[in-house]
Structures are given as C-alpha cells and as structure tokens.
C-alpha cells in the first residue's frame, strides 16, 4: 500500500499512521508532509524504525527550503517517480 502524508506530521494522527504501516508499504511525504523528513525530528526517528521505504517529493522540499536538512534515509523523488509509485500501489491511504 502507498501511504501519502500531505499534512504536517504535527497536525496528523501520526501514531495511527505508524500503526497502519505494514512491511512492504511505502510512504510518500509531500506538501507539508515533507517536514517529517527533516533530520533529527521525532517523526523521522519513528519512520526509521518502520519496515517501509520513505520517499519525499523533491519539488516540495525545494519550495519549503528544506533540501539541506533532509535525512539521507529519505529517498528523494520527482513527479514522474510519484506517478510510478501510484501505479505500483493500487491501494492508497492519504493522511
């Protein structure tokens, strides 16, 4: 399943998101959700312990001036890669 987090993790039920993640799921951070990828924050630490791959939309990182603050554990993608993820995962959960 593809999970997409488009809101700030501070304004989301992040604990519920973590509970619903399963091995093999993937999480895409976009819009304000990219703030979860900032190195050193508590949300990133939780994601590091999850059995998933975490992606962030590079254009949203650039728009928020966060490119130099993102953890190396996060896979940066563009809109073409975003489309590939949606094709790969017919089931999606939006947060």
Curated annotation (Swiss-Prot):
Print the keywords alphabetically.
Cytoplasm, tRNA processing
Source domain of life is Bacteria
> Where would you find the membrane-spanning parts of this chain?
none
Quote the SUPFAM superfamilies the UniProt record gives.
Answer: DsrEFH-like (SSF75169)
Q: Name one Pfam family in it.
A: DsrH
Keyword DNA damage in record: no
Q: Provide the GO biological process annotations.
A: tRNA wobble position uridine thiolation
The task this protein performs is described as: Part of a sulfur-relay system required for 2-thiolation of 5-methylaminomethyl-2-thiouridine (mnm(5)s(2)U) at tRNA wobble positions.
Family as reported in the entry's similarity comment: Belongs to the DsrH/TusB family.
Matches recorded under NCBIfam families? PRK13510.1, sulf_tusB_dsrH
Q: What is this protein called?
A: Protein TusB
């Amino acid at each position: 399943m593809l999970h997409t987090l488009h809101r700030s993790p501070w304004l989301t039920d992040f604990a519920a998101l973590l509970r619903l993640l399963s091995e093999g799921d993937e999480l895409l951070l976009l819009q304000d959700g990219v703030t979860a990828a900032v190195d050193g924050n508590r949300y990133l630490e939780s994601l590091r312990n999850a059995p998933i791959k975490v992606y962030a939309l590079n254009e949203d990182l650039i728009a928020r001036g966060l490119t130099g603050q993102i953890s190396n554990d996060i896979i940066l993608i563009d809109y073409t890669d975003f489309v590939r993820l949606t094709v790969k995962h017919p089931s999606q959960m939006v947060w």
